[in-house]
């Protein structure tokens, strides 16, 4: 399947593909399944019947059993609609715009809201940082690093490949200093401040496979990982803390925190029962699951970044975590913000 072009806007995704030799004679619905692996057969059939799939120089709408032939061009249109709505216990969640923190030459620094992806992937085609700023600046935008979809906070983007490559190299070679704010359940005292150095890896025999396991620091299993943790506030059954990852493993902060007895608030994967994650994934989460999580996403926020040639960037706390801390812990957010800014500047400078 040869891609002729892709175009993304916050409301419409357009793509054009050329049918290749090995695809000659395929049914249209089976051909489309290659591009939409997360779509059900019924969703693909609806796209065809709604005229969102068009074979060049043929009348449309087509039928699912229409055949495609070598060198034909197939145009696919995907309007945003309800495709990326985020629901929590039956209620639609707000999806706010990212906040531009700084634009310095070809570097863009933004405060990414929760549930926004870095760039289009899977079924997430619209609520993406690169798509938003390409539409905003009418210019191609490149990602420099990636944040998990649920993780909010500082996201770096570039306006040209050279700048993206330069700063990506800084991330990959450990020249970027990072700070994350987190809210966690207090199940035991890990002895703040401390360094977590357990190694990490996936276990392909474990379900869900995305779960990252910890292994002893002197183990031959997994890959080395290092996170420093610092306590900000201990209140009721919760810790508010800062994490400073020294390596960049997948789920590193969440995995180390859970292993040391303080799983993140709202973490469906590392809360002690991974089947909760599967129920949310399959959209069959129970009332008890929602009550256990308390909030729709894990409470992790990229709050500070220091590039080798820049001052420290510090992001405001996200609206959803602020709301929870006010209503559940009755915290003075201004005082907390000042504490975070002071600690992060001292640590990253």
Predicted feature descriptions by range:
Residues 2-349:
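RNA pseudouridine synthases
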């Amino acid at each position: 399947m040869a891609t002729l072009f892709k175009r993304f806007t916050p409301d419409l995704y357009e793509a054009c593909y050329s049918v290749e030799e090995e695809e000659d004679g395929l049914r249209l619905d089976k051909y489309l399944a290659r591009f939409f692996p997360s779509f059900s057969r019924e969703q693909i059939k609806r796209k065809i019947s709604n005229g969102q799939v068009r074979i060049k120089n043929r009348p449309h709408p087509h039928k699912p059993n229409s055949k495609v032939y070598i060198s034909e061009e197939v145009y696919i249109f995907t309007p945003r609609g309800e495709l990326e709505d985020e629901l929590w216990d039956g209620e639609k969640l707000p999806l706010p715009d990212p906040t531009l923190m700084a634009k310095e030459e070809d570097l863009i620094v933004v405060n990414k809201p929760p549930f926004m992806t870095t760039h289009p992937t899977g079924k997430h085609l619209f609520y993406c940082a690169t798509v938003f700023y390409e539409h905003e600046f009418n210019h191609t935008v490149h990602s420099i690093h990636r944040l998990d979809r649920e993780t909010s906070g500082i996201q770096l983007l570039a306006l040209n490949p050279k700048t993206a490559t330069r700063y990506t190299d800084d991330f990959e070679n450990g020249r970027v200093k990072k700070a994350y704010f987190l809210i966690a359940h207090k199940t035991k005292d890990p002895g703040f401040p401390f360094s977590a150095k357990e190694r990490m890896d996936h276990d392909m025999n474990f379900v869900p496979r995305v779960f990252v396991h910890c292994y002893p620091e002197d183990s031959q299993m997994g890959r080395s990982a290092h996170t420093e943790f610092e306590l900000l506030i201990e209140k009721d059954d919760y810790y508010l803390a800062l994490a400073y990852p020294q390596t960049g493993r997948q789920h590193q902060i969440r995995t180390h925190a859970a292993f040391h007895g303080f799983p993140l608030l709202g973490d469906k994967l590392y809360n002690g029962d991974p089947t909760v994650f599967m129920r949310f994934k399959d959209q069959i989460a129970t009332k008890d699951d929602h009550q256990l999580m308390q909030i729709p996403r894990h409470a992790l926020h990229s709050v500070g970044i220091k590039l080798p040639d820049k001052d420290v960037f510090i992001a405001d706390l996200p609206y959803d975590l602020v709301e929870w801390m006010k209503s559940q812990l009755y915290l003075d957010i201004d005082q907390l913000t000042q504490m975070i800014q002071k600690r992060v500047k001292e640590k990253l400078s």
